[in-house]
C-alpha cells in the first residue's frame, strides 16, 4: 500500500515539475501558499527523520521515508517558484495572511496542524514503539492541517501549477491520514484531536504580486 501511495504522491507532484511558473503570474494566494506550505513541509520532514531514526519498525520507517522524499521535493519546488516570482520567502504579514478567514500576523508554529517545539523534542527523545505511536499521533493532525491549507489553495490560487500541486497534496495526504489512522489502531492507539487553529478574522487581500 505504501508503494502505491508513493507512486500516487509522485504523480500528484509531477505537474509542478513539468512546468515552471513565469515571473509575475502569482497572486498573493499563490505566493502565500507556497511560502507557508514550504514551512509546513519542513516540519513534517524533520519529524519523519526523527521517526526513521528512533524506530526499527519497517512500516513506520517506510512511511517516514516516503514523507521525507515527497515533501522535501515539493518544498524545494515551492521555494523555487518563490525565486522565479521574485517573492520573499518570509512574509512581512506573518503566516496565513493569504488564506481567507485568517488575518495573518501569526507565527509559523501557529499554522494548522503544526506540532509545538516541545512535541518535536519529545519525539526526538522517544524510542521504539512509543516513538511509532507519537509520530503517527503528531503526523495525523499535521496532515489534516496541510489538507486544510491545500484545499484553500485549490479555491484561491490562480497559478495552474500551484492549483495542481494543492490538489495533489489534498489527495495524497488524505490517503496518508487514513493509512496512519489504521497503523495507530493496530498499535492499540488512537489519533489525538487536531488543533482547532486560530480564530478566523478578516479575509486576506486579493492583490496581485
Model-identified regions with their sequence ranges:
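All-alpha RGS (Regulator of G-protein Signaling) helical domain and cognate RGS-like helical scaffolds
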Residues: 2-209
